[in-house]
Curated annotation (Swiss-Prot):
<dbReference type="GO" id="GO:0003735">
    <property type="term" value="F:structural constituent of ribosome"/>
</dbReference>
<protein>
    <recommendedName>
        <fullName>Large ribosomal subunit protein bL32</fullName>
    </recommendedName>
</protein>
<feature type="compositionally biased region" description="Basic residues">
    <location>
        <begin position="7"/>
        <end position="16"/>
    </location>
</feature>
<dbReference type="GO" id="GO:0006412">
    <property type="term" value="P:translation"/>
</dbReference>
<dbReference type="GO" id="GO:0015934">
    <property type="term" value="C:large ribosomal subunit"/>
</dbReference>
<comment type="similarity">
    <text>Belongs to the bacterial ribosomal protein bL32 family.</text>
</comment>
<keyword id="KW-0689">Ribosomal protein</keyword>
<dbReference type="InterPro" id="IPR002677">
    <property type="entry name" value="Ribosomal_bL32"/>
</dbReference>
<feature type="region of interest" description="Disordered">
    <location>
        <begin position="1"/>
        <end position="21"/>
    </location>
</feature>
<dbReference type="InterPro" id="IPR011332">
    <property type="entry name" value="Ribosomal_zn-bd"/>
</dbReference>
<keyword id="KW-0687">Ribonucleoprotein</keyword>
<dbReference type="Pfam" id="PF01783">
    <property type="entry name" value="Ribosomal_L32p"/>
</dbReference>
<dbReference type="InterPro" id="IPR044957">
    <property type="entry name" value="Ribosomal_bL32_bact"/>
</dbReference>
Length: 55
C-alpha cells in the first residue's frame, strides 16, 4: 500500500483542494413557457429557444 513519507501541511492540502469546489448548473427561463431549464437543453415540454422542437 502507498504510505506518505512526510506529513503534508495545511497549505498544501488547501492547494490540492482548491479545484474541488462544485458549481451550480446555469439555468435559464424559457421565453415561451416561462419554465426554468438548463442552458442549451430542451425544456420538459419540448421547447428550445422559443420554438417547439419535440411534438
Amino acid at each position: 500500500m502507498a504510505v506518505q513519507q512526510n506529513r503534508k501541511t495545511r497549505a498544501k492540502r488547501g492547494m490540492r483542494r482548491s479545484h474541488d469546489a462544485l458549481t451550480s448548473a446555469a439555468l435559464t427561463v424559457d421565453q415561451t413557457s416561462g419554465e426554468i431549464h438548463r442552458r442549451h437543453h430542451v425544456t420538459a415540454d419540448g421547447f428550445y429557444r422559443g420554438k417547439k422542437v419535440i411534438a
